[in-house]
C-alpha cells in the first residue's frame, strides 16, 4: 500500500507548479494534502479513480486538508469532535476495514510563540483522539506536525530552541505521542540519517542551502511497525515550501 502526504501551502498555487504531474506519477493508494487554503468550490480537482474528501477552515484562505483515496472507506469524518479544535479544517479521518487513516495539519505555535498554549491543549486532545482510535484498530497518521523532534531533524538546532517548531514543549509532546504507542516511520527505518528535511523557509535561500527541518511525518501504531516497508522524502519535488513524503506499507 502506497501512501503520500504533502503540505502544499495552497493547493491552487501548487496545481500551477506541477502538483498533478506528481500526483499521477506516484499513483498512490491514498494521497493526502495539508494547508489547502481553500473554500468549497474554489478548485476543480477530482482525479479519476479516487474518492475525494475535504475539510475546509471557516476562515478563508487558511489551513484546510484533503484526502484522495482509491480504497473505499467504511466511514469518513472531519475534526476530532471538539468545537475549539474543529474550526480550522485540520483533521480528516478515514476508517478502513483494518486501520484508521488520519491526516492532520497541526497548529503552528507562531512567532513569539503566541499560540503555544493553544498548541499544548491541541497536542493533548489530539493524542487522546488517536489513542481512542488505536484501541479499535491500528492508526496511520500522516501530516505536517509542525515540530522537528530531535536535533538531527533540523539543520540549525542551536539557534532555533526558542522558535516555533523546536521548543522543548513541542518536542516533549511528540515524545509523549510516541510513548502512547506510536512510531515515527521515517526514524524507525533511518534512526541516524541526518539531512533528511521536508520543509525549508522561503527566506535566506534556505532550500538552496538545504537549511531545512523535518516536520512532516507518517506516524504509525507501534503494533504495525513491522509492516513499514519504506519511508520516502521526495526532496527534489518543488511546488511548496514543503516537499511530499511517502510511506510504503506491506
Predicted regions: what they are:
Residues 1-9, 98-110, 142:
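Active-site-proximal beta-strand elements of phosphoester/diester hydrolases
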Residues 7, 23-41, 101, 130-151, ...:
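Active-site beta-strand/loop signature of hydrolases that rely on acidic residues for catalysis
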Residues 30, 51, 125-211, 215:
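Metal-dependent phosphoesterases centered on the DNase I-like endonuclease/exonuclease/phosphatase
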Residues 37, 42-109:
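Structured beta-strand-rich core segments of catalytic domains in phosphoester-bond hydrolases
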Residues 60-75, 204-226:
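Conserved beta strand-loop-helix elements of the APE1-like EEP
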Residues 70, 94-97, 221-222, 247-250:
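Active-site beta-strand termini and strand-to-loop segments that position acidic
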Residues 81-82, 107-123, 158-162:
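Surface-exposed cleft-lining segments at the edges of enzyme active sites
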